[in-house]
């Protein structure tokens, strides 16, 4: 496969975006949002083709599925992005040197952003809206599981762009093949930034293979630590929401860490989990407390579960670093906050972590010591989301430290350049 010509067209098209005013970009985004609602039957039909090929028990099924409500949410997010202030031209630094030179550091687009993602057709729309608003062209490489959904979405966007006289190559969908991924990752000079959004396997492959700049997003092994001074009812609400609101997303809870002095409260903390039929893989202490108080068919010994997982997959190192993406989670007993912090440092992915505690000292220590993009006190990790943060749609959750970190929205997909104005000065 040879995609060089495709990348050349995208690069050329990206230059035309600089000619658009923010008002024009906003009008086009609103038109695409309107088209999503108007053409929702066709979009759902394409999505049904993808869903028919996937087992409903697959953790990716929920991510893949589009509904009328989800399409309305996608359109609403796109309209919201159109109302946000443009990041372009924003003066980040302004100074005049002693020699009279005037310096400004201003925000500009990256140029062409490559996005690699799995069975999540909503990402197609989110990436387009954020890239278009920020003056970036985008190259999309979706998973084969969502190929019909992604194709229908990009075709819709193209139709709207053409009616406004915009080169449709500003958003390009690549074939859903492994070869296309490799070509994108090696498209030096054409792709200015690549963002993978998916599981560990995808993230690791991109990081190890790419020759173009990469920002890692996605994989989350998420913890909630219930401290010795945690409020029981608050903890129950937070744990249930963090785990059960939507299990297939990267901010969903994977492991509850509970202070051993609060083990007697574990059955109450897990009531909401039982109602939602959540499978629990508990360590020995937690298992003994839950036995008889939690449905037998949903309660497992973590040690035995880990052995079965390792038998099925030689790459499994520990049950505690599992991103479940399903109605399953672990529970681990700790003797102190320090042990909880050590556990998170060992098994966490730097995504989102939370503590439930009324002890201000414990709260501040947790915030200071946890190395993650988003650190919560008395709130569920389900809030890690660009829209929830008031950023509009997100292009991903960055788990790295260089460049963007946390929810990536408009500002995070711009770079900057220096503008220097003089009056004929020369350097000695």
Task: Tell me the role of every PLM-derived stretch.
Residues 3, 22, 232, 263, ...:
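Residues at or immediately preceding the N-termini of alpha-helices
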Residues 83, 92-233:
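Rossmann-like NAD(P) dinucleotide-binding subdomain of oxidoreductase/dehydrogenase enzymes
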């Amino acid at each position: 496969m040879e995609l060089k010509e495709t990348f050349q067209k995208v690069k050329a098209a990206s230059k035309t975006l600089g000619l658009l005013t923010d008002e024009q970009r906003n009008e086009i985004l609103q038109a695409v949002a309107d088209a999503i609602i108007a053409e929702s039957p066709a979009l759902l039909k394409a999505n049904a083709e993808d869903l028919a090929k996937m087992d409903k028990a697959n953790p990716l099924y929920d991510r893949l599925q589009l509904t009328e409500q989800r399409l309305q949410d996608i359109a609403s997010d796109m309209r919201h992005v159109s109302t946000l202030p443009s990041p372009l031209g924003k003066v980040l630094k302004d100074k005049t040197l002693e020699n009279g030179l005037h310096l400004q550091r201003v925000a500009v687009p990256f140029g062409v952003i490559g996005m690699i993602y799995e069975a999540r057709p909503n990402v197609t729309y989110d990436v387009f809206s954020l890239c278009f608003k920020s003056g970036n062209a985008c190259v999309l490489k979706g998973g084969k599981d969502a190929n019909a959904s992604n194709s229908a979405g990009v075709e819709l966007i193209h139709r709207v762009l053409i009616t406004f006289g915009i080169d449709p190559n500003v958003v390009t969908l690549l074939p859903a093949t492994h070869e296309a991924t490799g070509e994108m990752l090696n498209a030096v000079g054409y792709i200015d930034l690549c963002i993978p959004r998916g599981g560990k396997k995808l993230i690791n492959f991109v990081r190890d293979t790419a020759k173009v700049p990469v920002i890692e997003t996605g994989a989350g092994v998420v913890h909630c630590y219930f401290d010795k001074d945690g409020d029981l009812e608050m903890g129950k609400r937070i744990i249930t929401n963090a785990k059960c609101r939507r299990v297939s997303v990267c901010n969903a809870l994977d492991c509850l860490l509970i202070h051993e002095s609060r083990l007697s409260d574990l059955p109450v903390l897990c009531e909401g989990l039982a109602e939602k039929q959540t499978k629990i893989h508990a360590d020995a202490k937690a298992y003994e407390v839950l036995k008889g108080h939690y449905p037998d068919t949903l309660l497992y010994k973590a040690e035995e579960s880990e052995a079965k997982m390792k038998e099925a997959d030689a790459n499994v190192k520990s049950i505690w670093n599992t991103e479940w993406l399903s109605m399953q989670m672990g529970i681990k007993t700790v003797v102190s906050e320090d042990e909880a912090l050590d556990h998170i440092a060992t098994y966490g992915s730097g995504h989102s972590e939370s503590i439930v505690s009324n002890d201000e000292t414990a709260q501040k220590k947790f915030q200071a010591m946890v190395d993650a993009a988003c650190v919560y006190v008395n709130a569920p990790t389900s809030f890690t989301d660009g829209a929830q943060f008031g950023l509009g749609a997100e292009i991903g959750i960055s788990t790295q430290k260089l460049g963007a970190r946390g929810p990536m929205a408009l500002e995070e997909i711009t770079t900057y350049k220096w503008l220097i104005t003089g009056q004929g000065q020369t350097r000695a």
